[in-house]
Amino acid sequence: MPRERLLSHGAKSLSNTELLAILINTGRKGFSSIDISNELLKSASNLNELKKSSINDLIKVKGIGLQKAITLKAAFELGERMGRRAENNRIKITQPSDVADYMIPTMKDLTQEHFVILLLNSKNVVIKETCVFKGTLNSSIVHPREIFSIAVRENANAIIAVHNHPSGDVTPSQEDIITTMRLKECGLILGIDLLDHIIIGDNRFTSLVEAGYFDEND
């Protein structure tokens, strides 16, 4: 049964037919929800076309009444909105303030230090963000190997390090600087540049690039 499979193996283990069957919920005499799902899928050439179906289109499928059609249409619209939001959230980084604007809302009130890596593609668009460490930043704890293995796995062209200072003071500590230099050196070897290290506190930030720590002569 689809519901039991979802509980035991997760939603990703279900076929399109099974996922639709859960939304349809109940069948009709002689037809299970799986049977109705199959008929529903046959009514459109693909999922994208099915998503565009109107309420009237949906109720033409045997076993789909008005309430089921409304449930399906609501689910399709929700999926569409989530997809649009994910696309809109992919930001392009052109300057340190872009990183700050993106990360300050989620990091400024954290009571513990979080070390986050932004993974960028060749156009400097953020393709993923991942928190690699929580706690007091220590250069011996933040391993370049772990960070760059993530970057390689996600096919990132560059990374930006971001971490917060719960105290609100955005002055780089000696550990911040050491960690930055280690990541920068490893990035040069691997061909995945560390573009910046941003420190966030309250509604302020410090860019180690703007502070001069990335200068070639340092």
UniProtKB/Swiss-Prot annotation:
Motif (JAMM motif): 163-176
Family: Belongs to the UPF0758 family.
One Pfam family here: UPF0758_N
InterPro entries according to UniProt: MPN, RadC_JAB, RuvA_2-like, UPF0758, UPF0758_CS, UPF0758_N
Name of the protein described by the UniProt record: UPF0758 protein SAOUHSC_01763
Originating species: Staphylococcus aureus (strain NCTC 8325 / PS 47)
PROSITE patterns per record: MPN (PS50249), UPF0758 (PS01302)
Binding, Zn(2+): H163, H165, D176
MF annotations from Gene Ontology: metal ion binding; metallopeptidase activity
Keywords noted in UniProt: Hydrolase, Metal-binding, Metalloprotease, Protease, Zinc
Sequence ranges assigned to domain MPN in this UniProt record: 92-214
GO-annotated biological processes: proteolysis
